[in-house]
Every structure is written in C-alpha cells, then in structure tokens.
From Swiss-Prot:
The gene is prsA. It catalyses: [protein]-peptidylproline (omega=180) = [protein]-peptidylproline (omega=0). Its EC number is 5.2.1.8. Keywords: Cell membrane, Isomerase, Lipoprotein, Membrane, Palmitate, Rotamase, Signal. PROSITE patterns: PPIC_PPIASE_2 (PS50198), PROKAR_LIPOPROTEIN (PS51257). Coiled coil: none annotated. InterPro entries: Foldase_PrsA, PPIase_dom_sf, PPIase_PpiC, PrsA_foldase, Trigger_fact/SurA_dom_sf. This is Foldase protein PrsA.
Length: 320
C-alpha cells in the first residue's frame, strides 16, 4: 500500500506511555516510570523528550491496527501471506538470506509477517470504501509489449544510440514487425534494449493510465488488441508498442483493482483519511489525551498534510 507508510509506522514503546497518561501527565508517584536518589523519571518527562507527534503517531497506529484486525481478520487469508513470504525467500536466495536481509532492516520474520497482514487489512478497508468496476479497470489498463531502442542522454553513455541512429533503427524494426506481427516477441528478444522485458518477448504486463511516459501511454491506449504501433518517441527512446490481448484479465483483475485504488488515494488522500475517520466513529474511539487528539486530527487525519508529505512505501519494510 502506497500511502499507508506515512501513517503506519512501527509501534514503539512510547505508545505504552499513553496508558499511564490519563487526561494529562503529571509528576505524581503513579506517573513515575523510574525512581532514584537523584530524582524520578516521569511520564511527563519522557513524553517531552520523545515528542507528542511521535507518541500520537505510535498510539494512533496501535489503535488503528487493533480496529483493522477486529474488522477484517476473517477476510485476510494467512495462507496467501505465507505464499508472499515464500516468494520473497526465493527472490533472496533462500530463507536464511531473506531473514538476514530482514535483520538488516531491524525486522524479524514474525514482524514482517505481521506487517504484511496489516497491509492486507488496509487493502480490505480501501476496497470497502473505494468502489471500482470491471469496466473502469478495463478502461484504465492495457496489456502491452514493446521494443525499445534507447537514446543516449550524453555521448559518454555506454547504452543506447544517438537520437538519429536510434530513430532509424526503430523504424527498420517497425517495418520488420509489420511484415509479420506474430514474430514480435522473437524480434523483441533480439533487438529491444529494455533487457528486463526483452527476456519475456517484450512483455510489460498491464500498464495503467498515469503509470508511465505520457507519449508511450497515449500511443498504447489508442491501439486495439493485437495492433502494433508506429515508432513512438518517449523520454526513454524509441518504441514499437504492441497491445496484447488481455486473455488473463480475470486472474489479474484484483491486482489491477488494488493498484487503481492506490492511484486514487495518492491523487486524493482524503479518501484514506475519510476511511480512517469512519473507522474511529464505528468503533467509538475516544482520545483521553487532548494533545494526542490534536496531533491526530490536525496532522494524521488531515489530507492536506498527508499530501504535502508525499506517498510512501508499504508497511512490510521490504519490496515485493
């Protein structure tokens, strides 16, 4: 989830302080955390040191996670989460290497799994609040393949060609493809300078509107399924684009929907903050500390503040 990490940070011990705070922290004995002959350390001292913003964020996170777990625990499949973890382990070359990589980020395997579960709860929440139809998914996505001839940004670049040479080569390839479109994949594997997609016959999978270069997108979404474009120039170089038939649409539909939801939230963070506010109301959330309430309302649940902060990565702590 792209927008989630801005609000959902790892819960620290500071969240536990709130249980002792009550309406406001004082220097009374019952609010003393540590005592000594040199003096006591109180809840108020610690809150002042840590900062109310961090405490508010941590406490809000803890509360939100409890609510999400209560509401969506029956909708999140642990088997799918385990499959995600197994996939990551393979990418890292085995379980031991994966867990070592987690440790370098201050995570345990259990914490990583917990983060994946929380991210899944958020997906369920946003799916409840933001409705996207099949027709909208089809309108905003297109399955594509391409052949790319890169243009050097400077003469010293090792990859790519000069603009004139790149354009000429792309035009030659386009003519070759036009003669026999069924050989597109074979030609892409041989000629494309996008090595990642070239290995897969030029396949890019599903491209969403707003996800890539504007000129590439414009050309792609004009094509009918199975059609091949003329040479298209983008910020990456020159492309020959093919609109692939979406034969696997049904199996990819849920993933595409989640990506479109992410896009909507990034463009309009109010969708996320409104979803949180609805949860607080549904679960009768009552802030016992005025300062915490103020930070949550003015910063965490303020869509403008969230927008200024920008979209961040998901909660798992590692790329998937």
């Amino acid at each position: 989830m792209k927008m989630i990490n801005k609000l959902i940070v790892p819960v620290t011990a500071s969240a536990l302080l709130l249980g002792a705070c009550g309406a406001s922290a004082t220097d009374s004995k019952e609010n003393t955390l540590i005592s000594s002959k040199a003096g006591d350390v109180t809840v108020a001292d610690t809150m002042k040191k840590i900062g109310k913003d961090q405490i508010a964020n941590a406490s809000f996170t803890e509360m939100l996670n409890k609510i999400l777990a209560d509401k969506y625990k029956n909708k999140v499949n642990d088997k799918k989460i385990d499959e995600q973890i197994e996939k990551m382990q393979k990418q890292y070359g085995g379980k031991d290497k994966f867990e070592k990589a987690l440790q370098q980020q201050g995570l345990t395997a259990d914490k990583y799994k917990e983060n994946l579960r929380t991210a899944a709860y958020h997906k369920e929440l946003l799916s409840d609040k933001i409705k996207i139809s099949d027709s909208e998914i089809k309108e905003d996505s297109k399955k594509a393949s391409h052949i790319l001839i890169k243009v050097k940004s400077k003469k010293s670049d090792k990859e790519g060609l000069d603009d004139k040479e790149a354009k000429q080569k792309a035009e030659e390839i386009q003519k070759e493809v036009s003669k026999d479109p069924s050989k597109f994949g074979e030609i892409a594997k041989k000629e494309s300078m996008d090595t990642g997609s070239a290995k897969k016959d030029g396949e890019l999978g599903y491209v969403l509107k707003g996800q890539t270069d504007k000129d590439f997108e414009k050309a792609l979404f004009k094509l009918k399924d199975g059609e091949v474009s003329d040479v298209v120039k983008s910020s990456f170089g020159y492309h020959i684009i093919k609109a692939d038939k979406p034969t696997d649409f049904n199996s990819e539909k849920q993933s595409l929907k989640e990506k479109l939801v992410d896009q909507k939230v990034q463009k309009n963070p109010k969708l996320l903050t409104d979803a949180y506010k609805d949860l607080l109301k549904e679960y009768d959330v009552d802030f016992k500390d005025r300062d915490i309430k103020s930070v949550v309302e003015d910063k965490i649940l303020n869509p403008e503040k969230l927008k200024q902060g920008g979209a961040q990565g998901g909660q798992s702590g590692m790329s998937q």
